[in-house]
Amino acid sequence: MFKWVTPASTATLSRCTLPATTAATTTTTAMAATRTATTTTRTTRPQLLSIALTSLIIIVASFVPTTSGFRSIETNGGGRKLFGGYRITPKHCRATKTLPSSDPRANGPTICMFNHECAQRGGEVVGACMDGFLFGACCQIPPTHELASTLINEAQNAYFQQHQQQTKLQQSAAQSSFESYGEQQQSLSEEQVAQQPSQNIYDQQNLDKVYQQLDSSSSISPPNGAYGDEPQQQEYQSESEQPVRDENAYPTSSSSTEATQSQSSSASVEFEQEPSQPADASNDQTTQKINKQPVQPPNFHVHKHSVTINSPSSPPQNDDFVMQVLSTLPPEHADDHHIVFTTEVPTKITSGLQDQTSSESNSFEEVSSTPAATQKPKPKPTQMPTQKTTQKATQKPTPKPTQKAKPKPVPQLAESMKRPIQQKPQQVAKPKPSPKPAQSTNNHHHNHLILDGGEFTHSDITHPGADADLVEDLQFSTGYGPQPVYAEPPKQQQQQQPAEQSYISSSTSAKRPTTGHNSPTTVSSITTHVDSIESIILQLNNTSHGPSYNVVSQQTPSYGYPGAAVVQTEPAAQNPTFYQENESEKVQESDSQSDYGYTTTVNYESFYDKVSDEQDASAAVSQSAEMPTARPGYGEDVSAVLEDHTMPANGYHDAEAPVAPQTSEFNKMPVMGIAYPVDMSYMEEEGNLPATAAGYGQMSSDSYEASTESTYQKLSTVQTEEPQPTYVRPTTNANKQNRPVASYIGMVTMQHYNPQPGNGDYQAQVPPEVSVSSHTTKVQEQMDETSNGYQQSETTSGYVSPPTAVPAPAQRPQYDAVQGDASSERPVLVTASPRPRPKPSTKRPAVKRPISGESTKKKPQPQPSAGAYNQEKISEHSTRKPVSNGYDKVPESPITHIQIKKPSATQHKEQEQTGYPRPASPAGYEQTTAAAPAPAAPSLNYDKPDAPPSQYDQPSAPSASYDQLAPMPSLNYNEQHASSPGRKPSTAKPISTSYVTGPSTPRPPATVDYHYDNVPPLFMADDKLDAFIQSTAENIVGSTPGNYQPPLVATASTPAYAHRPTSSGSYGHKKPGFVQINGTPKPPRPTVLITPKPTAINLVTYSSLSDDSNKLASSTSSYVTGRPGVQGVSSNDFKDPGYFGSSPVHVAFTQSTTEAVYAVPSDDKPAFPGYFGPTPSYPAFSVPGEKVGQNVMEETYTSPNDFVNFPPVRNPNLNMSAASSAVTSDLDLSTPAFVEDVVLKDKMHTLVHKLVASLQGNFEALADMIEEPGSNKTVATYQAGAGGTAKPVRVVTTRKPVRTATTTRPKVTTKKPVTRVTTKAPNKKTSAVSTTTRKPATRRTTVAAKVTTTTRRPATKKPTRRVSSTVKTTTVSSARPADDEIVDEEDEEDVNPNPSDNEIDQGATLSSYGGANGRKIHSTSRTLPTPNLAFHSPSTECGVRPHVKSGRIVGGKGSTFGAYPWQVLVRESTWLGLFTKNKCGGVLITSRYVITAAHCQPGFLASLVAVMGEFDISGDLESKRSVTKNVKRVIVHRQYDPATFENDLALLELDSPVQFDTHIVPICMPNDVADFTGRMATVTGWGRLKYGGGVPSVLQEVQVPIIENSVCQEMFHTAGHNKKILTSFLCAGYANGQKDSCEGDSGGPLVLQRPDGRYELAGTVSHGIKCAAPYLPGVYMRTTFYKPWLRSITGVK
């Protein structure tokens, strides 16, 4: 209801403003609405008007609560504490269910679901713990992917359309009333305008403060208020009028010239400007007024009051959440242009109220600036883009008044372009920027603060970045495109659309959103999205994705258009020209814009029309562009958002494609919840600042920071006046890491602009740009988890600053920068482009530049500032801080700088080409990220920006830098680049984002189309993906931003490849992206997915699938290669195998391969060897050859099945492919993952033949053979045979193995084995040899498992007597000896019942696969045997394995029963035991205590149960029963920090001591000074077999090398994460991510064998970013560090 009303009212407003006169009235209306309280009487004039006002008020009222509710939701939902004191789902992951249905996010980009379900839907887990699969993790589904499949989405779409129609009607009705009201209001606004300049600063600050407080409801409003009448007018008009304007604008915009400029500028600034325009355009009559506006600070004042009350304003905030989804705004926007894409709608509503919020949410800050500019541009709009550009600066004051009325529609677009200039000349504009920041801030603040404030951390847990994104995303529930919901951008677009057409509108929207989206990205950072673990750590998603959606949106823009990328590069240079040529070269510009997904936005300002043309030109790309519409509005924002949230961050990044890919999944994380916190602190600081004029911006910033995402959007809305600030938004993007910070920066910048620039000095705009920068930073952060992103972020900030000078350009530049960055980082980040912008008109600046005046301004700004630019940068960073007022004051900046420092460094790097590469370095990036994450860090970041300012001065360099940024990722990007030349920057980021990218690209095309149509088309593209997007898009429909994603999705299929590249950059992060990687460049990307960890790898992968494979191969080892080669795409598709057809094929192939691979180990073998080879202690794969024999079987078996079956990456091997491609496809995991060694295979084959022969007659001989040769040799052979046997089975098994080897095995084993075993067992008994022989045969049938068992059996047989004399037999015997009882299961000992035995055997076999492998390894040190024998007195023994005779288990496969007797399964029981789920792993250390992870603490009203001696959780394959004990109490480490997983350790005290047995043995504690660095350790658990994969039924084991902490830290940096590896952490895994622990393994043991054959506990599974992702090794709690604590409680020695 609420939503509906809001839409209606908004729509009404919108309607009213639609006509030119209406525009004026709208302005008034908006103002009136803004000051509903103040001007209620006036509103009475027109009944409709009063009604509209009433609705607005109601909306405001509802929004305020809603906002509060949202906050709480953010806090509650986001902070949902599922487990003990910490919420498993990232805060941004508030499950869609918690969102109002109207919330676009409710579509489910982030839904609480099991990780494997998430993976199946191509989503990205943004907030899962290692045990996420057990509980539900925040799954960010690529809008395209998931939404499409979501009924809700469809419903939403339908609703949206319906809503839009209704809204239109309402709007038309309200239009008339609003017109009169608007006129009325306009006069007021005009009056106010005069005072606005003086009051601007103060009001802004005050408003900011007030709004920050109001945050949710006021927040939006404040922008208007902050702006004062004019701002409000603009904003409001933006909202109300925008639609009008849009309509007008459509026609006006229609004129390509005007449209182009208007669209370009307007897109980002349009909304903001709209209000201005209303003053201007609306005021044809009010022309004077507009002039006055700049002069009237009072307007601000009045607005302040009204703003506070302003319904529209406040609704937008809520809208972000509710409205966003709600069509309300969209309807308005629909009127506007349907630019109000559904996705954008929410923001749009927010925006609508403050148009900027949504659209410019990210860009809106820029818009904010621009709004002022807008006004100026307004007159300008009439002029050609070029003229506009020039006029902007020059004419701004004059033309504005003059052309105001007429240009209004176009002007908006033009304004957008001119915004920067406008802002400079116009004080109003400038104040507006300030207000805008305030609004943005508020919006963000609302969301961000809340999220940031408390929830931040949580996200961090899973995915810091995601968290941050989520936080911001909160507004956008999932942070995918919809969130950005910058309805505004769409609006602008709408206006633009007129000029260009819907398409352009779309494009504009997308692009604009880019700017705004940067901010929104921040806001968007919802996701989360973080990949699950990645989501957890990084996102700990991405990636993302989940998060894909946003990403998609964003990404698309980024390289939605090939041009986008180009724009980045070319546009940088070209853009300026284009900008100027805007109209004439629209198409080209479009290309440029294409280049920048976001860049487009930036470009948009300059050449919205062009963009549209280009979009038209490149429909597919266009989609991207269109997407940009959504994307910018949300693309960028979303990008950031998504990225942050879901890898979506990556997705967003995709917009920035280059950056996003790099961090892809990590980006999300990087966006760092940490960044959030930083933001928060910033916010707080900024909160103070708001007091000052700078404060306004700062306030905004503050809000921004706090609710960067939300606020950003909202702020954007508020700042609608300050489009330039939108640039700031990009800054935010740039700071994405500090997402909030960045946002804030932008905000602050705006403020600075306002205060400092005065209106004339567009430095004020610089801050807006900074704002963008901020946003960009955010995006970058998100996008870039990679250093690129971050640096970009910095850069963006810097850029943003300059843009401040040229708000419109800033905005545009933002995009440009972003694009450039985006290329490298997130398009938004590219905002940094602004840096280049000044100088590199060439790059982004060009885009901005086109704004001519703006460009000049921009440039001048940077130049004037050179110090100023620097300052701007500082300010930008600083801006966030107090610098706001001191934008000019670089000094203040410094503080900000400090915050930005890191980014700065990054930026610096980024800026410097060299720098960029460095950013490319995850380390730098990470730092940036870190900076973002830590408020303090941000300070540093900011500081650095100080330096960057210099660089900023040389934006050109930065531009190059960006390119260079791209360079690092260049490989990827280049590929991407190839796809979209402009995208080159993409190259920088893409690495990380790589995988995300894939998916998103496809989407854009679809989106573009429907985006084009605005609402209706919105849903059309990519139904499935688009469906997902649809809902999003639909939401976004109003605002193209949403469409953004869809376009990406649209391209998903093959086109995806083509488009994907575009998407890729932005989308790269998206986890879904993996699959989507199809982007043309993506094909390689898929592989990239596989290699997400290493940037380099990504790059390579990026290059081409083959390359990818190679890369993987080289990086990973053969195994990777094999797998990638075979499944390069598959991998990528893996996630979306379902989503994308490609995957299936691979899967099939893989399956075949599995068998084949198994058989043809050479192929996969390389891949597996990497996986498996390492798995065993044996580093060499050849060694595995022996063990691999069985192992291979096992692995192969496990691999396919495991991957398919269990998401747990417990089987890192499985995860190998997943790592890069993160379980891109089942095949991926299956065939390649388990290829062990060719030698093994050969042996197996030979053995199999032998076995077959022997089975027929010489089973005894076989057994003897096994025993005599020294279990090792024989065993190996035997096993090999078994393996061979298994192999054939395996083929079948492979499929079956969905559960992967383990499951399959168990199943096969269980069923077949039992029967066979039983039958055979007797035979066996009769003739042990004979039986054995037979059994193997049976086993064979069973699947390799049996064979494996067979091997064991022989051992077992001996073991029968083995207990006494097991030395020889020991190998097998040992394992079996303790077996005696166990023997039957492991051996075919007649002692135990055959069936059981068989079953167990099977289990053993399964285990055998892992365990057999171990046996194979036949670490003959049958040390175990001794333990086995000794085991009879388990009470005195620890670390022994009575059931296992072989030394080690080769990793990544099912282990054997009793192989890890200390393994505990921690289950959670809820509802009095009605529901139980496997939550985590654990380690038995004494008869009464179990160690697990702190994040495994029980949820609300839940209790934990510890199951000892468990092996097959699906059935009873064990010879011995497991023992279940209730947990009496959970002792969580006091210093446990869910945000960083510090001290992630907990002790479970059992209600009664457990009786030790052969299958229940405690683990030994390591020596206090033990150092396991460089050794191979074994991780066991029932966690997912691969990231996003399924869960195995039998215990899985994986061998991983323990890495030195410093190396681990470096690896994380390389992957673009700034995660700090503490001394209490222990890292284990491979650089190429072959194997790793995964969700569900949490709390499980990481053990090593001591010289005496016993096993000791090196660490417990804690967390990781994704699972087995390149350069993201798993993180464990170092046992030696916690021994004192453990000893103090348990007394263990």
From Swiss-Prot:
Q: Which residues cross the membrane?
A: 48-68
Composition bias, kind Acidic residues: at what positions? 1380-1391
Protein's name according to its UniProt entry: Serine protease filzig
Residue span of the signal peptide, if any? none
> Where found, per UniProt?
Cell membrane
InterPro entries reported in the protein's UniProt record = Peptidase_S1_PA, Peptidase_S1_PA_chymotrypsin, Peptidase_S1A, Trypsin_dom, TRYPSIN_HIS, TRYPSIN_SER
User: What terms describe the molecular function in GO for this protein?
Assistant: serine-type endopeptidase activity
**What is the first-listed, main subcellular location in coarse terms?**
membrane
E.C. code: 3.4.21.-
User: What's its membrane topology?
Assistant: Single-pass type II membrane protein
Domain called Peptidase S1: residue spans: 1449-1691
| Cysteines engaged in disulfide bonds, as pairs | C1480-C1496, C1608-C1627, C1638-C1667
Q: Which Pfam families match?
A: Trypsin
Query: Where in this chain does the entry annotate a coiled-coil region?
Result: none
